[in-house]
C-alpha cells in the first residue's frame, strides 16, 4: 500500500518540482552547488545505476524541489522509466524539453521516448527542433543517427553514458551473478506463466548455450531450456524456465480466442543490441490466417520473437519469421476461466492509447542473451 501511495504521488511531486523557484544567473549557479543538493543528486544517481528506482525517484524529487533545473528532472525521468512508469516519464520529459531549450538533453530524451513508444512522427518533429537550436550538439547528432540507422533503435556509445543514457540500467534478480561480458543478444522473447517462463524462437539457442533474459526495466535472470513442447516445437518455438520470476506488473495474458483480423494491434520488441534497452512499439492492424495454418499475418513491422498485444494492451501472441514476405504471429492463449457462480456479465475493457499500451507491455517482452560454451 505504501509503495502504491508513493507511486501515486510521483505526478504531484513532479508538478511541485515544476513550480519550484526559478532562480536565475548567479543565484541559480549558487543553488546548483548547494552541498545538500549535490549530495542528493549523487546518491540518486548511484541508486538508479544499481537498479533501485524507488529510492532514486525519492532523491531526485527532493533535489528537484530545491531548484528548477534540468539535471534533477532528467534523473527523475530516467528513474520513472527504470520503475516502469513510461507515461509519467513521457509527460515530465515534455515539460523538461520545453522549459530547458538551452540544452539538448531534455529534447533528445523526449524524442527517444516518443520513438520507442510508437510515436515516430512526433519524435522526428521534436528532434528536428532540437537540431535547429543546437546543430553542432554531439548528443543530438548521436540520437539522430541512432534513430535513423536502425529500427528498432539501439543505444550505444555516448547514448549509454550515465548523463545521457537512453536505456535502463541492468539489475540482477535474486542476487544472481550478471551475464558474462561475451553474452550477446540472440532474440526477443515473450514472458508467459505469470513471469516464470518465456517463449522464444528455438533457432536462437545453440546446443551448449547459456541463457539470460532481460526486460525493459533492466531486470535480468538466468534461464534454462524446458522440456520440449510439441505444440511450440511445431512452430519453431521453445520455452525457457526462468531462475527467478520476472514481474509482469499489470500486464494481462489473453484467454479464449485471438483478435479478429482487422483489429488494431501492436508489437513490442528490442533492437539487436547487447546492452540493456527500452523496447520499441510498432502498430497497425492484425491480419488474417495464413493459408490452412493457425498462424496469422501481422500486418505491420515486428521483429521475430516480439510480443503481440491487442488494443487493450493484452498479450495475445508472439511474432514469427516472415512467411511469403509477410511477418506472422502465433496466438498464445490461455483457456477461459470457469465463470464464478452469480457473477454479473463481463464488461469489455476500453481501448488504450499507445502510451498506455507501451507501459502495459513493457514487462512482457524480453531480450534473450546467450553465450556458447565449448
Regions found by a protein language model. Give the residues of each.
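Catalytic-histidine neighborhood of serine endopeptidases
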Residues: 193-235, 242
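A conserved glycine-rich beta-strand in the N-terminal activation segment of trypsin-fold
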Residues: 175-202, 220-222, 304-307, 353-355, ...
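Canonical tetratricopeptide repeat
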Residues: 42, 75-76, 109, 143
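Flexible, gly/ser-rich surface segments that form the specificity/activation loops bordering the active-site cleft
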Residues: 247-304, 318-329
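C-terminal cap/linker of serine protease catalytic domains
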Residues: 149-175, 248, 274, 315-374
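Alpha-helical segment of the N-proximal tetratricopeptide repeat
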Residues: 30-66, 75
Amino acid at each position: 500500500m505504501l509503495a502504491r501511495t508513493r507511486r501515486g504521488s510521483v505526478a504531484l511531486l513532479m508538478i511541485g518540482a515544476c513550480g519550484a523557484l526559478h532562480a536565475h544567473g548567479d543565484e541559480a549557479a549558487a543553488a546548483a552547488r548547494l552541498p545538500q543538493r549535490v549530495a542528493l543528486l549523487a546518491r540518486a544517481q548511484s541508486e538508479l545505476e544499481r537498479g533501485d528506482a524507488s529510492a532514486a525517484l525519492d532523491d531526485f524529487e527532493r533535489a528537484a524541489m530545491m531548484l528548477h533545473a534540468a539535471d534533477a528532472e532528467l534523473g527523475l525521468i530516467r528513474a520513472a522509466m527504470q520503475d516502469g512508469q513510461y507515461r509519467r516519464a513521457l509527460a515530465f520529459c515534455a515539460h523538461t524539453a520545453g522549459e530547458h531549450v538551452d540544452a539538448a538533453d531534455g529534447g533528445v530524451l523526449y524524442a527517444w521516448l516518443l520513438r520507442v513508444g510508437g510515436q515516430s512522427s512526433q519524435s522526428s518533429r521534436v528532434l528536428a527542433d532540437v537540431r535547429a537550436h543546437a546543430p553542432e550538439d554531439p548528443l543530438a547528432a548521436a540520437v539522430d543517427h541512432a534513430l535513423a540507422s536502425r529500427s528498432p533503435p539501439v543505444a550505444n556509445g555516448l547514448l549509454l553514458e550515465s548523463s545521457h543514457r537512453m536505456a535502463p540500467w541492468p539489475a540482477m534478480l535474486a542476487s544472481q551473478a550478471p551475464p558474462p561480458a561475451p553474452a550477446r543478444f540472440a532474440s526477443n522473447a515473450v514472458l508467459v506463466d505469470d513471469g516464470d517462463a518465456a517463449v522464444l524462437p528455438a533457432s536462437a539457442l545453440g546446443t551448449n548455450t547459456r541463457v539470460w533474459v532481460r526486460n525493459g526495466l533492466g531486470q535480468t535472470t538466468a534461464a534454462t531450456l524446458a522440456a520440449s513442447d510439441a505444440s511450440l516445437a511445431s512452430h519453431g518455438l521453445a520455452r525457457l524456465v526462468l531462475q527467478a520470476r520476472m514481474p509482469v506488473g499489470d500486464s494481462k495474458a489473453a484467454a479464449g480466442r485471438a483478435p479478429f483480423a482487422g483489429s488494431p494491434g501492436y508489437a513490442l520488441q528490442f533492437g539487436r543490441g547487447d546492452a540493456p534497452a527500452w523496447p520499441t512499439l510498432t502498430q497497425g492492424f492484425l491480419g488474417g490466417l495464413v493459408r490452412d495454418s493457425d498462424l496469422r499475418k501481422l500486418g505491420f513491422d515486428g521483429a521475430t520473437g516480439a510480443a503481440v498485444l491487442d488494443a487493450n494492451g493484452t498479450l495475445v501472441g508472439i511474432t514469427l519469421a516472415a512467411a511469403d514476405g509477410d511477418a506472422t504471429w502465433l496466438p498464445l492463449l490461455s483457456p477461459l476461466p470457469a465463470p464464478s457462480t452469480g457473477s454479473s456479465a463481463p464488461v469489455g475493457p476500453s481501448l488504450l492509447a499507445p502510451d498506455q499500451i507501451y507501459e502495459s507491455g513493457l514487462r512482457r517482452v524480453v531480450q534473450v542473451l546467450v553465450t556458447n560454451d565449448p
